[in-house]
Every structure is written in structure tokens, then in C-alpha cells.
Amino acid sequence: PGQLSGGEQQRVAIARALAKNPKLLLCDEPTGALDYVTGKQILKLLQDTCRQKGVTVVVITHNSAITPMADRVIHIKNGTVESMQCNDHPASVDLIEW
């Protein structure tokens, strides 16, 4: 693993987590070490996993531009829930730009 780049390590970690077929997948900045194209591919994979396999995917991010893909958005500030919104029509990752 030490010979892999940060982005490669991140992709391997996500692949290992998905291989376990979890009911809940917690992703802290899943695109943080990735380029734009690979980041979109990973987000698409996570969205498809959620929709097709019924896995609950929690994405923690500072990138508010990706919130349209979420079913629910929870904003936390200083450890306190600041707001919570439900999104009845989540956008496809393909339509999101940042």
C-alpha cells in the first residue's frame, strides 16, 4: 500500500469496503484524493450501490456542490446539526459539476 498514490489507496479502500457487501457504508471525503473524473466515477459507483443494492451510503464532505445527489442532506457546524433537508428527486452524479 505504501507504493500506491493517495488516490489509488482511496480507490482500494472503497473497493475493499464494497466487497464486504455492507448494509451501511460510511465515506469520509471519498473523493478527497481523486481527480475530477475519477471522483465522479466513485460518486456514481456509490450512488448506484445505494440505489441498486439498497445499501445506505453516508457521504461526509466539505464539497457542497455534490449535495444534489443526496436523498438527505444534514449540515453540521461545530458538532451540532444546523439543518436537515430531504431531497425527493436526487440528481444523477452525471449531472453534477464542481
Q: What residue ranges belong to the model's regions?
A:
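ABC family nucleotide-binding domain
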Residues: 1-69
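Glycine-rich, phosphate-binding/catalytic loops in enzymes
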Residues: 44, 77, 91
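Conserved catalytic segment of ABC-fold P-loop ATPases
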Residues: 69-75
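Conserved beta-strand-loop-alpha-helix hinge in the C-terminal portion
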Residues: 80-98
